[in-house]
């Protein structure tokens, strides 16, 4: 009997232990399968692209709503991760990860400010590569004057302390930064991603303007960027469809030594003049298309090609605006014999042109207007010399 009682007690203890273990197992939270829930780079499918009409120097593609891939040129690759989304595992070292919202940008590429301005996104920029007095874009100047945007040094000498204190999440540089690669390395070492703007390498003026879409992607305003670009194309469409006027246009400025700086035939200014219906007075035969497509020639060479030009446009963005033909002739009396000078068809482009990247369309409209009417008024960037 005693032996039987011991056996029954042992059986009851085993049963109790089993029940307790099952209960504890029921209370234990399930461990998620990390391999199934985590987002991986290889698992992303970029199956939707931002439509581009003319730009060739960048592309934007999407994997769902949370991941945007941006490529620039042949050597820049970015993954833009939506706010509150997971950073994928296994992102290649060649891909720079950015996190939305980008709200502490260091903007050194001054030509890009106009894109941010049109997207109502100047407030995303905390640091500037220009001082307040150097800005012609009012929203940028105002932001610096009120202190929401601060000067952080030019491309070759950034203020690293200010950049780190601001919590900078992206530095946007122009291609001049390639002359000081150590700056890129230092920024990246301190945790600041670097994007080098290449709109100047677009072969088409309309491709330059289309970079609005890239900045729209960076700040999450692609729809606004696309609609504004479509409006601009619609405004230019009647002009682009017209036949050339046959009139010749020279675009130039005179440097301090008396030589003349002109655009090569493949430059975007030369192409903008052609889009407006003019024939650009060319000084080369290469048709080279790159960001440095300017050349300096002697005044005698310029005179030989431009003496019969129907219209002259003086590029005052470099050495200051001129207002009269007499001021132009002070720089070079030889120009007095030029057809455009004698007929009073000499114009000056205003200094704010190069900061207003989207205004390239307005320049096309301006040139078209003076080709149609030598007395055209109320233009965006061109002013007739008196």
Set out the residue ranges of the language-model regions:
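Sec-dependent N-terminal signal peptides of Gram-positive bacterial secreted proteins and lipoproteins
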Residues: 4-22
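Bacterial Sec-exported substrate-binding components of ABC uptake systems
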Residues: 19-113, 224-251, 375-386
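A short, structured surface patch at a secondary-structure boundary
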Residues: 68-74, 78-164, 170-177
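Soluble non-cytosolic domains of exported or imported proteins
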Residues: 99, 153-158, 174-181, 202-209, ...
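Extracytoplasmic ligand-binding site segments that recognize negatively charged/polar headgroups
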Residues: 103, 110-113, 128-139, 179-182, ...
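Structural recognition of the beta-strand scaffold that forms the well-ordered cores
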Residues: 104-107, 124-128, 170-174, 194-198, ...
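Structured C-terminal subdomain patch of bacterial secreted/periplasmic proteins
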Residues: 202-230, 311-386
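Flexible, glycine-rich surface segments
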Residues: 241-323
């Amino acid at each position: 009997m005693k032996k039987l009682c011991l056996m029954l007690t042992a059986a009851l203890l085993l049963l109790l232990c089993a029940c307790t273990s099952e209960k504890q197992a029921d209370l234990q939270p399930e461990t998620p399968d990390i391999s199934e829930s985590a987002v991986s780079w290889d698992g992303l499918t970029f199956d939707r692209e931002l439509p581009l009409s003319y730009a060739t120097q960048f592309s934007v593609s999407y994997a769902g709503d949370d991941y945007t891939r941006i490529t620039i040129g042949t050597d820049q690759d970015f993954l833009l991760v939506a706010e509150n989304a997971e950073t994928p595992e296994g992102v290649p070292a060649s891909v720079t990860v950015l996190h939305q919202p980008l709200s502490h940008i260091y903007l050194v590429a001054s030509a890009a400010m106009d894109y941010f301005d049109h997207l109502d996104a100047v407030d995303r920029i905390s640091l500037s590569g220009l001082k307040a007095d150097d800005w012609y874009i009012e929203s940028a100047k105002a932001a610096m004057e009120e202190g929401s945007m601060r000067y952080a040094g030019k491309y070759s000498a950034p203020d690293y302390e200010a950049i780190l204190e601001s919590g900078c999440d992206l530095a946007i540089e122009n291609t001049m930064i390639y002359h000081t690669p150590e700056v890129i390395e230092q920024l990246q070492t301190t945790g600041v991603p670097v994007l080098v703007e290449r709109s100047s390498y677009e072969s088409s003026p309309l491709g330059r303007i289309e970079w609005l879409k890239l900045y729209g992607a960076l700040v999450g305003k692609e729809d606004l960027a696309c609609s504004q670009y479509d409006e601009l194309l619609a405004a230019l469409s009647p002009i682009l469809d017209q036949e050339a006027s046959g009139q010749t246009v020279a675009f130039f400025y005179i440097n301090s030594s008396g030589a003349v700086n002109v655009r090569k035939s493949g430059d975007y200014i030369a192409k903008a003049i052609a889009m407006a219906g003019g024939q650009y007075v060319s000084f080369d035969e290469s048709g080279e298309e790159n960001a440095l497509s300017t050349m300096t020639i002697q005044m005698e060479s310029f005179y030989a090609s431009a003496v019969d030009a129907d219209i002259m446009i003086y590029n005052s963005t470099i050495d200051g605006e001129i207002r009269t033909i007499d001021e132009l002739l002070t720089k070079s009396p030889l120009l007095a014999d030029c057809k455009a000078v004698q007929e009073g068809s000499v114009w000056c482009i205003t200094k704010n042109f190069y900061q207003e990247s989207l205004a390239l369309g307005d320049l096309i409209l301006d040139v078209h207007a003076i080709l149609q009417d030598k007395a055209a008024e109320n233009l965006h960037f061109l002013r007739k010399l008196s």
